[in-house]
């Protein structure tokens, strides 16, 4: 079975130069030609590896292609190459101990001899250039995006500055109008206060004059009342004096009558 694996690998590698499928590129053809050359030159090593290392397996599809190839009468079997995963075949070859030291340099040399510029297996210069172009395009897009963002930020800043200036101007105008209105209101309030003071002063003066007049009238009335009281007192004193005199006269009269009566009584006795 191990020999069958090697035979299949050799057969597929040998048939790779006859690939007619458009889906299989020159890169794969040159790579398998290099593998075939190494297998032929070191057949015993490959057979020993296949017999002693059970982990060394061929990718699916290789044996099927081998069977079609051994039974076909023409190159129609090459149409089955599209069913194989060439990347898996390369992975299988990477498992050999001498891949890095011997097989990889041979494959790179074969690719370069075929006119394929390559820096490492799996990537060509053209692919690298394509990636560089893509990176350059991405960088250009990033630069344009950055420029657009910067322009947008500048416009936003300008708009914000203009809006702030207009708002400041409107606020200043509103404050000035408010201040003027406040000054006018204060002036009118001062006039009203002055008028109120004047009116209050006149009213107070009139009230004081009225109070003074009333006080003067009250004083006159008081003087009259005092004079009347004095007259009443004098009259009372005079009446008292007269009454006292009359009482005294009545006393003397009563005493005289009593004495006369007493004297008459004595004479009768």
UniProtKB/Swiss-Prot annotation:
Predominant location category: secreted
Swiss-Prot/TrEMBL induction comment: Induced during anaerobic growth.
Disulfide partners: none
Lipidation (GPI-anchor amidated glycine): 245
Glycosylation sites: 234
Pfam families for the chain: SRP1_TIP1 (PF00660)
Protein name: Cell wall protein TIR3
Signal peptide: 1-22
InterPro entries: SRP1_TIP1, Yeast_SRP1/TIP1_CWP
Organism: Saccharomyces cerevisiae (strain ATCC 204508 / S288c)
Role: Component of the cell wall. Required for anaerobic growth.
Keyword terms, alphabetized: Cell wall, Glycoprotein, GPI-anchor, Lipoprotein, Membrane, Secreted, Signal
Location(s), subcellular: Secreted, Cell wall; Membrane
One Gene Ontology term from the biological process aspect of the record: fungal-type cell wall organization
The organism's place on the tree of life at top rank: Eukaryota
Protein family according to the UniProt entry: Belongs to the SRP1/TIP1 family.
Keyword Glycoprotein: yes
Membrane topology: Lipid-anchor; GPI-anchor
One GO location term (cellular component): fungal-type cell wall
GO MF entries: structural constituent of cell wall
Species lineage: Eukaryota, Fungi, Dikarya, Ascomycota, Saccharomycotina
PTM info: Extensively O-glycosylated.
Propeptide position ranges: 246-269
């Amino acid at each position: 079975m191990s020999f069958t694996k090697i035979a299949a690998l050799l057969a597929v590698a040998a048939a790779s130069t006859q690939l007619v499928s458009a889906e299989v590129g020159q890169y794969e053809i040159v790579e398998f030609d290099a593998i075939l050359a190494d297998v032929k030159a070191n057949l015993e090593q490959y057979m020993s590896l296949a017999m002693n290392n059970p982990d060394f397996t061929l990718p699916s599809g290789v044996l099927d292609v081998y069977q079609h190839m051994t039974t076909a009468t023409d190159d129609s079997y090459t149409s089955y190459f599209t069913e194989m995963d060439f990347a898996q075949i390369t992975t299988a070859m990477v498992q050999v101990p001498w891949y890095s030291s011997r097989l990889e340099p041979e494959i790179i040399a074969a690719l370069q001899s075929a006119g394929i510029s390559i820096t490492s297996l799996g990537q060509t210069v053209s692919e690298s250039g394509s990636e560089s172009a893509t990176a350059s395009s991405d960088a250009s897009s990033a630069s344009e995006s950055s420029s657009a963002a910067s322009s947008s930020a500048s416009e936003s800043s300008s708009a914000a500055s203009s809006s702030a200036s207009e708002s400041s101007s409107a606020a200043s105008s509103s404050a000035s109008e408010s201040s003027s209105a406040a000054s006018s209101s204060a002036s009118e309030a001062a006039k009203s206060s002055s008028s109120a003071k004047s009116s209050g002063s006149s009213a107070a003066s009139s009230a004081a004059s009225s109070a003074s007049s009333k006080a003067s009238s009250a004083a006159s009335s008081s003087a009259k009342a005092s004079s009347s009281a004095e007259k009443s007192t004098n009259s009372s004193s005079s009446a008292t004096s007269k009454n006292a005199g009359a009482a005294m006269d009545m006393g003397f009269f009563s005493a005289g009558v009593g004495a006369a009566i007493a004297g008459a009584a004595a004479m009768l006795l």
